[in-house]
Amino acid sequence: MNGTEGPYFYIPMVNTTGIVRSPYEYPQYYLVNPAAYAALGAYMFFLILLGFPINFLTLYVTLEHKKLRTPLNYILLNLAVADLFMVFGGFTTTMYTSMHGYFVLGRLGCNLEGFFATLGGEIGLWSLVVLAIERWVVVCKPISNFRFGENHAIMGLAFTWIMACACAVPPLVGWSRYIPEGMQCSCGVDYYTRAEGFNNESFVVYMFTCHFCIPLTIIGFCYGRLLCAVKEAAAAQQESETTQRAEREVTRMVILMVVGFLVCWLPYASVAWYIFSNQGSQFGPLFMTIPAFFAKSSSVYNPMIYICMNKQFRHCMITTLCCGKNPFEEEEGASTTASKTEASSVSSSSVSPA
């Protein structure tokens, strides 16, 4: 084995010289240069500075403007709540521990950090799945006369929390466990060991199947069908310039959504699966650290993709920030009108993300 396994930790370094120490008790500067820990703390601080305001603003603007309190926006708010879970439960903890060079908060802190980071990420992921299903049902109309209402939104919210808890809770109760990973300043699911009594192997297979592959398949199917529906509508109205603009807008939205999902999770999932399927192989602490924290940065660009591209929300946000007046009123109003005209040629509901 090319690492050192101890009680509730695994460090990717063989303890041949006796310098390896518990990540709960001693700085881990023998893994990487102390400057790397400072850089990690600075990056977490940067994510907090961006992630908290944009997600809090999303919640505040939606509550302030009644016209934004639509059933679909319940899901978008859920996405913002998930991102705030990651900011408060994950980023602040990691920033604090990286300043010390080890997981100074102990086992309890590791469990809490791992739980909240996993819960926030999973709520966000399953919220995207619900959004994809809603767009597919409303635009492609596989169910005739379906209208997405408040009850559907509430069921969608409950579904995201149930699925998120189904992934985040088991490591707290003995099915797998949370341990420090990478540079030992943040905690995640144990992909690294076959620790007796924790059934890590079965949990990792379950997590990858039910909480990565299935969501990715659903999102790909729904947005693929949505794109086909837009193309078919555009082909039936070749002379309509507004329809062509609608096709380009939705195509761009779909590409951003799918790419955003893959950029968030594919590197982390790929590295985690590699470590799991090649346990005992040699890898450095940065091998898991970089994709893990790049995935967490989704709390910043999630709201940009799924909410800030909504013209109505953007108008309300600018109005709130500018104390009740939108200096770009004419431009925003024209854009919103054009968007509604474009959308009507494809679906009576909408083809934009909200």
Swiss-Prot record:
Tell me what topology the record assigns in the membrane. Answer: Multi-pass membrane protein
- Places the protein is found: Membrane; Cell projection, Cilium, Photoreceptor outer segment
Q: Which InterPro entries match?
A: GPCR_opsins, GPCR_Rhodpsn, GPCR_Rhodpsn_7TM, Opsin, Retinal_BS, Rhodopsin, Rhodopsin_N
Residue ranges, Extracellular compartment? 1-36, 97-110, 174-202, 275-286
Q: Which UniProt keywords apply?
A: Cell projection, Chromophore, Disulfide bond, G-protein coupled receptor, Glycoprotein, Lipoprotein, Membrane, Palmitate, Phosphoprotein, Photoreceptor protein, Receptor, Retinal protein, Sensory transduction, Transducer, Transmembrane, Transmembrane helix, Vision
Q: Provide the record's note on post-translational modification.
A: Phosphorylated on some or all of the serine and threonine residues present in the C-terminal region. Contains one covalently linked retinal chromophore.
- Residues assigned to the Cytoplasmic compartment are 62-73, 134-152, 225-252, 309-354
Q: Could you give a GO molecular-function term held by this entry?
A: 11-cis retinal binding
> Where do transmembrane segments lie in this chain?
37-61, 74-96, 111-133, 153-173, 203-224, 253-274, 287-308
> Biological process GO terms, please?
absorption of visible light; G protein-coupled opsin signaling pathway; visual perception
Q: Where is the composition biased (Low complexity)?
A: 334-354
Record has Hydrolase as a keyword: no
Spell out the disulfide connections. Answer: C110-C187
Main location group: membrane
Residues bearing PTM N6-(retinylidene)lysine: K296
Example GO CC term: the record gives: membrane
Report the residue ranges where the short sequence motif 'Ionic lock' involved in activated form stabilization is annotated in this entry: 134-136
* Chain residue ranges for the region called Disordered: 333-354
Family to which this protein belongs: Belongs to the G-protein coupled receptor 1 family. Opsin subfamily.
Q: What does this protein do?
A: Photoreceptor required for image-forming vision at low light intensity. While most salt water fish species use retinal as chromophore, most freshwater fish use 3-dehydroretinal, or a mixture of retinal and 3-dehydroretinal. Light-induced isomerization of 11-cis to all-trans retinal triggers a conformational change that activates signaling via G-proteins. Subsequent receptor phosphorylation mediates displacement of the bound G-protein alpha subunit by arrestin and terminates signaling.
Record's protein name: Rhodopsin
Record lineage: Eukaryota, Metazoa, Chordata, Craniata, Vertebrata
Question: Which gene carries the instructions for this protein?
Answer: rho
